[in-house]
Amino acid sequence: MTAAGLTALVRDTLARPRAAADTLVKLDLKPDVLWTAAALSIVLAPLSRLPFLLFSSVDSMQGDVAFSPVMIILVRAIVLPLLICAFWIVARVLGGKAEWSHVAVVVIWTELMLGLMSFASSLVALVGGQDLLRLLQTASVLIILWVYVQFLDVVAGFDSVWRAVGGVALAFIG
């Protein structure tokens, strides 16, 4: 995939998530590529906090062990496979025809997008402060939930977006 194709996929993910899901599914990535992408997503996750870590004083980071790069990697290494399995199981239970590789590619891509949005939010927060950071992070989570609903609807082949909403809720709750 070229840089222009990647940029278009990022834009489509935010503006036309169903088209982005179709594009991701059509890539038909093999399991070794998916595992590599998952590892990349896990390892890159701490970079979303890089601006905060670089430009914050040591005093402001007291008690911030939960957000250390090692902890972020450990949590992501546990959560990402669980999230993929949860979405796949929920899609199947709700009558969808989702394939594991299709669910994996959209979940991994969505998590990479969340990391990108968190990084951008952290950069903006350097200028705008912590209140702006909280606002941008909340907006990022809402956007990602909307993207998850659209992606799950496409990969599971549901006939109703409301079934996908329920699927996303069940995947995160269960």
Task: Label the predicted regions.
Residues T36-S48, W109-L114, A171-G174:
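Alpha-helical transmembrane segments of multi-pass integral membrane proteins
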